Structure formats: C-alpha cells, structure tokens
C-alpha cells in the first residue's frame, strides 16, 4: 500500500520535495530519510520492512507505533492500518502479514 498520512508537516514536506524549516539536519539525513520513506511507501505489509536489516524495524514499546531507522540518531515512526481489520480480529491473519498502509508518519530524534 502507500503512506496515507503524516503526523508532521516537515516530514510531509520532505516527502513532497518541498523545503522545510525543521530542526533536524536535513543536509545530513534528508537523502537517506527520503530513501527510507520510499521503502515505507513500497511496503505492502509490516514484514516487508524486516527484509532489509538496515531498516532496524521495531515495534515501539508502549505505543501502537513502529519505526525504521534512518541512522543511529534518527528514525521514521508510523502507525500501521491493516486493509482488513476483521481478518486480524478473527485471527485468520497476523498483523505482520496483513496488507495495509502507514499512517501518521514522522521523523523523530531517537536520543
């Protein structure tokens, strides 16, 4: 599926190729962040993000969010909306294998 929404105007601006005034160092992480956003946009299920070890895909403790790493300091955080919630609820498919979309995407300082 695709990225459906952003939680941060600056992350959305980066995705759309617009200038941003965000405090994160766009000149240092911008190109790599955009590559990772493309990876997220191309993912059809959460397990797709596990295929590349460099993503360092993880579930964020205490939230319904996930992240992939841009580098040691920065990560892209997002929620996952399965296309068929009823299949998840019935147990016929695991969330990690369920087709879906990324929601509320934003770049966060890990430290």
Kindly give the residue locations of the regions a language model identified.
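Sequence-level motif detector for i,i+2 pairs with an aromatic at +2
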Residues: 1, 35, 52-55, 63, ...
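Arg/Lys-rich, positively charged N-terminal/basic patches that mediate binding to nucleic acids
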Residues: 1-36
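Generic structural signal for well-ordered secondary structure
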Residues: 4, 30-33, 49-53, 71
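Amphipathic alpha-helical interface surfaces
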Residues: 7, 33-36, 56, 70, ...
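Basic, Lys/Arg-rich DNA-contacting stretches centered on the C-terminal catalytic core
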Residues: 18, 22, 58-60, 110
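Conserved phosphate-interacting/catalytic interface
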Residues: 40
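A short, surface-exposed loop/turn module that caps and links secondary-structure elements
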Residues: 44-67
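Enriched for short, Lys/Arg-rich terminal
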Residues: 61, 66-111
């Amino acid at each position: 599926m695709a990225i459906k929404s952003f939680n941060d105007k600056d992350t959305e601006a980066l995705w759309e190729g617009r200038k941003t005034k965000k405090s994160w160092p766009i000149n240092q992480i911008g190109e790599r962040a955009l590559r990772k956003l493309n990876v997220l946009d191309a993912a059809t299920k959460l397990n797709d993000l596990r295929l590349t070890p460099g993503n360092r895909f993880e579930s964020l403790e205490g939230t319904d969010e996930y992240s992939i790493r841009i580098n040691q300091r920065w990560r892209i955080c997002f929620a996952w909306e399965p296309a068929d919630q009823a299949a998840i609820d019935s147990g016929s498919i695991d969330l990690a294998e369920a087709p879906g979309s990324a929601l509320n995407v934003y770049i966060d300082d890990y430290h």
